[in-house]
A protein has these predicted regions:
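Bacterial Sec-dependent N-terminal signal peptides
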Residues: 1-22
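Glycine-centered loop-to-beta-strand initiation motif
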Residues: 66-75
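Short, aromatic- and glycine-rich surface loops/edge beta-strands on solvent-exposed regions
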Residues: 82-91
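Non-catalytic, glycine-rich low-complexity segments
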Residues: 21-49, 95-105, 112, 272-283
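Short strand-turn-strand beta-turns centered on an Asx-Gly dipeptide
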Residues: 56-59, 90-91, 321-327
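Aromatic-lined ligand-binding clefts that engage carbohydrates, nucleic acids, or primary amines
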Residues: 44, 268, 296-324
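Single conserved hydrophobic/aromatic residue that forms the stacking wall/gate
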Residues: 337-347
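Extended carbohydrate-recognition surfaces in non-catalytic/accessory domains of CAZymes
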Residues: 141, 149-156, 160-164, 224-307, ...
Length: 347
């Protein structure tokens, strides 16, 4: 009995050691990725220290050994555009890899804005797009004041299809299509953007040395305690604002809710929407909620069909009701509401 137990434990220990030695790749090195053509390409990851790592790509082998910190890296030589190819990294198999031009797209909300929010003007184009030679990956939002991250979970590649096109950055979508039209080689878009972010937030500590004030701010945010204090303060202010906005909104508490069609609005003022003064009081803008009501006539032929409501640029958010039914809302300016399949008839 003792002999059998020792044998089983030996096997389990060996299995445990084997599983721990498994090579790991960052999320961005995955199925469907695009590698830069005609330039050396780095492939990297993690494993147990001293682990042998072999990368096989286009029938060529590239080997290395994981260092003391478990990190490893191999460099592929410059390659011509083409694909799709497969790659193996020890026991990991990656499929549908292209070699072409890889572009980093970064910026604020103008780069984050998705193609799905410009379908009003480009609906037919976006709905019919299918190009497996165009790939896209959006880097998930996140920050780390202690240095670059080894991995970014959720950074998954997608091909351009009519289903995925609305998820693309609108700017990157049209850019990628134009680049492919010009070059006829695979195009990979890496979208690392964050609305409202300052350029200093993207700079390294070394790059900030010439900017003392921004460097001081960075040093402050290096403190986990300071960041936690800022987060708590921000959450508290948001709760205060949300509560004050809700309690102070007469449209929600003055008898019949102002989104109801039976509301008597005869004492409401008529507003000149092209005037800059309707949202101001004593020369200053009024922060809070503004309610508008508009009656429109819908023909029998139009009734029951899908429709699009264009409100233009709304700052900062809107909620829309038709005959008392919520048909959509927008957070952040461009308001384009598609009215379809309501829970009950609108007309």
């Amino acid at each position: 009995m003792k002999y059998k137990l020792a044998l089983v434990m030996s096997v389990l220990c060996a299995f445990s050691a084997w599983t721990e030695a498994k090579v790991k790749l960052p999320a961005i090195l995955s199925d469907g990725m695009v590698l830069q053509r005609e330039r050396p390409v780095k492939i990297w990851g993690n494993a147990d220290k001293g682990e042998n790592v072999t990368v096989v790509f286009k029938k060529k082998k590239f080997s290395t050994v994981a260092g003391e910190d478990g990190k490893w890296l191999v460099e592929l030589p410059p390659m011509k555009a083409g694909g799709p190819f497969e790659m193996t990294v020890n026991d990991i198999r990656l499929k549908d890899i292209l070699v072409g031009d890889v572009w980093l797209c970064s910026g604020q909300s103008n780069m984050e804005l998705t193609a799905g929010r410009v379908t009003d003007k480009f609906a037919e184009e976006i709905a019919r797009d299918e190009n497996p030679m165009i790939r896209y990956v959006k880097i998930p939002l996140g920050n780390d004041l202690h240095g670059p991250k080894d991995d970014l979970p959720g950074a998954d590649w997608m091909s351009l299809t009519k289903e995925t096109a609305p998820s693309f950055s609108a700017l990157a979508y049209f850019f990628a299509k134009e680049m492919y039209r010009e070059t006829q080689v695979p195009v990979g878009i890496v979208n690392s953007s964050w609305g409202g972010s300052s350029v200093e937030a993207w700079m390294s500590e070394e790059a900030l040395q010439k900017f003392p004030r921004q460097l001081h701010e960075r040093d402050l945010f290096n403190s986990d305690e300071y960041r936690e204090l800022c987060n708590r303060s921000g959450q508290m202010m948001n709760r205060f604002w949300d509560t004050a906005l809700y309690k102070g909104d007469r449209g929600l508490h003055d008898g019949i809710c102002w989104n109801r069609p039976e509301l008597d609005d005869t004492d409401w003022q008529t507003v000149d929407m092209f005037s800059k003064e309707w949202g101001r009081k004593n020369g200053y803008p009024v922060s809070g909620s503004h309610w508008f009501r508009q009656k429109v006539n819908v023909s029998a032929e139009q009734a029951g069909k899908e429709a699009v409501l264009r409100l233009g640029c709304m700052v900062d958010a809107d909620s829309v009701f038709v005959n008392g039914i919520s048909v959509g809302n927008t957070f952040y300016q461009l308001s384009l509401i598609h009215i379809s399949e309501p829970t009950r008839p609108l007309y």
